[in-house]
Amino acid sequence: MPMLDAMQTQRAVRLLITSKPVAHEVLLRLLELSLKAPTRTNTQDWTYLVVEDPEQKARIGTVYGRLYKLFNPIVTRQAKGDAQELRNMAPGQWQAEHFAEIPVFVIPCYRTSVNHRPTGRPQIRVSSFYGSVYPAVQNLLLACRAVGLGASLQTLPVWWQPSIRKILDLPRDVRPVCIIPIGWAKGRYGPTQRTPIGEVVHLDHYGNQPFRDPVG
């Protein structure tokens, strides 16, 4: 799939074929492409954990299930009465119920032990951490879409850091950023619908939106 088509049709794909594995040669090529993304001063302070072992996936799935049961009722209440929003939530429900069956998890992590690690105020450190990892994450999501794999960015499973760190045997200087469940996508996906660009672009200062369509 051409890259522009992948970008125009990208979405969080949660409905996956659980019985079809993702070959290592395919996954490694996608991970290699994802790491073409830039990092702060080219420190390349990232690392990936690939989880395929059923027992490991089940352990992570247990953590995810507990958090999902905790937070999903809140989201469901917020969507009450909105039929479209409730339909949009259905793939997430399926994913939560089948999380451990998904063929592979990719867990991008940040290594704080590299040189030039950010210092100073917490917001500076956090923005530097994520700014060095999320460009590669987006590359991976696009690469998956381009070859027909479904993928979604999940942060909920890593909210419970102590459990995830213990399951994955993570050293102190390696921080999980998110979990990306990956498998071959079920169904076909057309272009995504987004807010018109004129509604979200401000020129020179906030509130100046010359690209908006005139009302009426």
Task: For the regions a language model picked out, list residue spans one by one.
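Short loop-to-beta-strand entry elements in the cores of soluble alpha/beta enzymes
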Residues: 41-52
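A glycine-rich helix N-cap at a beta->alpha junction
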Residues: 69-79, 167-193
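Short connector loops at helix/strand junctions that flank enzyme active sites
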Residues: 43-45, 99-104, 175
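Glycine/small-residue-rich phosphate/adenosyl-binding loop
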Residues: 50-133
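Glycine-rich, charged/polar anion/phosphate-binding loops
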Residues: 32-35, 89-94, 164-167, 187
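C-terminal helix-cap and adjacent tail motif
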Residues: 6-9, 13, 177-216
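Small-aliphatic-rich amphipathic alpha-helix that forms the alpha element of a beta-alpha
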Residues: 32-34, 106, 112, 118-166
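N-terminal targeting/leader regions
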Residues: 1-21, 25-33, 37, 42
